[in-house]
Design a protein with these regions (language model features):
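A conserved ligand/cofactor-binding region detector
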Residues: 1-760
Length: 760
């Protein structure tokens, strides 16, 4: 009680000083700023985690989401503060709405990095993130005329989690020099100490460069480097800008790391004993040649010494087997952007070429392109995949040539999620019920969720879990009505697919199912329980087919929701500007989690884990972490469909998949695909977009939508039928929650530390 009084007194003092008001008289926006200040003060009192060895997690993106709720939970003051605000007629959830969401990431890669930082701090490990401070992030998604429009996402406010450290470094791009400014965001562990997320900005950044939408002068690098995450790279200027950004990040990161090591008094020759650098995907790869450059040109190392030290310091996480996502930069671009790295990269490449003749493992290929992943594998000490099946595909197929050379470097670290955000913060009701039922040990040791299995025949427990889900669905209905203007039925089945828009994730297959179901209802076959399909996804502005898929979904939602024959039985909504905050509303309300990527293409996925933890049942392919979810929950608590990865890989090897064959032999597939260009759809949508998507499915279909479509329809219909058996469904929900403990990022990080970083 005394602590609570102190907290209330402190907050009143802060709001009094800022606004001349007490808590009760403040607006939600004012209270957000006050609580932000209070939280930052509490974090400043939290000891920084220290140790002999430290990990630096370098990533192009950190999709951290809003931080207020998470920080309050980790500091252990969420409940107290919530009660104080309630006492003063205020609601913490309303205050959280006033917080802008940092726009520092895009998809699973950035969200994983954020979960990892939370777990590193929670486990008391010394570890900081290194990235860039994007002013407008990826983009803000706005729907107009059934199309995605991109606008700048202006999120940085005067009062924010960003702390200007005053630290500056110089970064040279040949003769062009820029000065960086370092901003830190504090990362507090759950009931533990503090680490940092280091975000570099440029001193001369100019937001006024952005004129219309997200268009800006890509060549003004002294002003534009930190404006956007993943600027459009469909032209040479865009490609060069990405290299500028990547080098800016790693040059700053390398200087910061070496500065910290020197300040601790360590000899740089002992760098691997004091530093582990985790390279998150290929974007930070240039940290390897950059460290070698600094050590040889500024620290007196020989080339052999520098390569040896750096190779024992850097480790690489592979996140994809998609060829287009494994960066390959023309050597001429690197020569132009960072001429000082050119001789280092050539030296690294020559050493590989002398040792290995296989063209597939060269750093610089015959077309004079630099393969970034190849630098990571040759000159790092660890290569990890992010799910069991993904790592096996890397070893046996995609990176097999490297695996034969370095079998000892390859290891698997199945991804995880932080339960603080994805349970304690986003579903207070479920977290409170679990604590009441099995105790609160699961908050520190997620495997304790298994205790829930002891209650799988306890009707009161089953009913409570089901009722919490209904509550979250009702809350989501209200939120979507407010945000999207669509009225949903809380008693319908919520079938949700939220993730980056990409053909391999196959939102287009879900769209074809929805068309099939729409036509069934029009033909008089009505579902027993109404259906609600929810999508959330952004498409890269230069990715035309992805834009077309969004167009089809928006057109279909217009047709379905405005058809009086269909809308009582089925609704479709694509939420605008899907982000972490939206995910925190959608995930607890989901019944069926759509994880339908083409087998072999999704490295892991983490959305599947978040949905599972919140009691949704997975409908998915045998891909990524779905495979491990399947193993944990068993055949009766998941819906698996489609061809397996071996079959898919064989189709690619033989180049024998012809989508038109499936279209011709299946009336169901033909009817659904043809509907895309039917009069009914063309009346609402744009002919160019719809015909392009139609032709893509019929003539190319690179990610084999039509291969799995019939099985998808059959298994999804089965899932909807099973939902009618409430008792069965409640047990499925319970088993999924109970078995989710394995997917805690605390477990993942403990494994990284045990096998890769070896921090004390």
């Amino acid at each position: 009680m005394e602590f609570e009084m102190n907290l209330e007194q402190t907050l009143n003092e802060i709001t009094g000083k800022m606004y001349g008001k007490n808590i009760g008289a403040c607006t939600d926006a004012q209270l957000y700023t006050g609580v932000l200040q209070l939280t930052k003060e509490k974090m400043a009192e939290t000891p920084v985690i220290t140790g002999d060895k430290k990990v630096y997690y370098i990533s192009m993106e950190f999709l951290i989401g809003k931080l207020l709720s998470n920080n309050l939970i980790n500091l252990g003051i969420y409940e107290e503060l919530s009660d104080i605000l309630k006492k003063n007629g205020k609601n913490l959830a309303d205050i959280e709405e006033a917080e802008p969401e940092p726009s520092l990431g895009n998809g699973g890669l950035g969200r994983l990095a954020a979960c990892f930082l939370d777990s590193i701090a929670t486990l008391g490990l010394p570890g900081d993130g290194i990235g860039l401070n994007y002013h407008f992030g990826l983009f803000k998604q706005v729907f107009k005329d059934h199309l995605q429009n991109a606008e700048k996402n202006d999120w940085i406010q005067k009062d924010s989690w960003l702390n200007n450290t005053g630290t500056k470094f110089e970064v040279a791009f040949g003769d062009r020099k820029v000065t960086s400014v370092l901003y830190d965001i504090d990362v507090v562990g759950y009931e533990n100490g503090l680490n940092k997320l280091h975000l570099f900005d440029i001193e001369t950044v100019d937001e006024s460069l952005v004129k219309k939408g997200i268009t800006f002068d890509k060549e003004a690098i002294e002003k534009n480097l930190t404006l956007f995450l993943y600027p459009d790279d469909s032209d040479e200027a865009g490609n060069l800008l990405r290299i500028y950004q990547e080098y800016f990040m790693v040059c700053n990161g390398a200087q910061l790391i070496l500065k910290e090591v020197k300040e601790k008094g360590y000899d740089l020759h002992t760098l691997p004993e004091h530093v582990a650098i985790q390279i998150n995907d290929t974007h930070p790869t240039m940290v390897i040649p950059e460290l070698i450059r600094i050590l040889t040109t500024e620290e007196g190392f020989t080339m052999d010494e520098a390569i040896d030290v750096v190779s024992r310091t850097c480790a690489y996480t592979n996140h994809t087997i998609l060829a287009e996502a494994l960066e390959k930069w023309p050597l001429a671009y690197i020569e132009k952007v960072v001429p000082q790295l050119d001789p280092i990269i050539k030296e690294l490449s020559n050493r590989v070429a002398k040792k290995y003749k296989d063209e597939k493992v060269q750093i610089i290929d015959k077309d004079k392109r630099v393969h970034m992943a190849h630098i990571d594998i040759h000159y790092g000490y660890s290569v990890n995949g992010v799910a069991a099946i993904h790592t096996e595909i890397l070893k046996q197929s995609e990176l097999n040539h490297f695996y034969k050379i370095y079998p000892e470097k390859f290891n698997n670290k199945t991804n995880g999620i932080t339960f603080r955000r994805w349970l304690l913060s986003c579903d207070h009701e479920l977290a409170a019920f679990l604590t009441q039922t099995i105790g609160d040990g699961y908050k520190k040791d997620a495997e304790e969720l298994q205790k829930l299995l002891e209650h799988k025949d306890d009707q009161a427990v089953l009913d409570a879990i089901y009722d919490i889900k209904k509550t979250k669905k009702t809350e989501l209905v209200s939120y979507i009505k407010d945000k999207e203007g669509v009225e949903l039925n809380p008693n319908s089945i919520f079938d949700i697919q939220v993730k980056r828009l990409h053909e391999y994730k196959r939102q287009q297959m879900n769209a074809l199912y929805i068309i099939h179901k729409y036509l069934e209802i029009k033909g008089g076959k009505k579902p027993s329980t109404p259906l609600t399909f929810i999508f959330g996804a952004k498409a890269a502005p230069a990715y035309v087919i992805a834009q077309d898929i969004i167009h089809l979904l928006l057109v279909m939602s217009d047709i379905i929701n405005n058809d009086p024959e269909v809308s009582p039985y089925m609704k479709l909504v694509m939420v605008e500007n899907y982000n972490v905050s939206y995910a925190e509303k959608l995930i607890p309300a989901c019944d069926i989690s759509e994880q339908i990527s083409l087998a072999s293409k999704e490295a892991s996925g983490t959305g599947n884990m978040k949905f599972m933890l919140n009691g949704a049942v997975t409908l998915g392919t045998s891909d990524g972490a779905n495979v491990e979810i399947h193993e944990l929950v068993g055949d009766d608590n998941i819906y698996i469909f489609g061809q397996d990865s071996d079959t898919v890989i064989k189709h690619y090897e033989k180049a024998d998949y012809v989508s038109k064959d499936y279209y011709k032999k299946s009336p169901v597939i033909k009817e659904a695909v043809d509907f895309i260009v039917s009069k009914e759809v063309l009346k609402v949508g744009k002919k160019e977009n719809l015909e392009r998507l139609y032709n893509e499915l019929l003539n190319k279909d690179w990610f084999m939508t039509l291969l799995d479509l019939e099985d998808y329809i059959k298994v999804k219909d089965q899932a909807f039928a099973d939902y009618e058996d409430q008792q069965k469904w409640k047990k499925m929900m319970l088993v999924n929650i109970a078995k989710a403990g394995f997917f805690s990022s605390d477990r993942t990080i403990a494994e990284y530390n045990r096998d890769i970083w070896k921090l004390k």
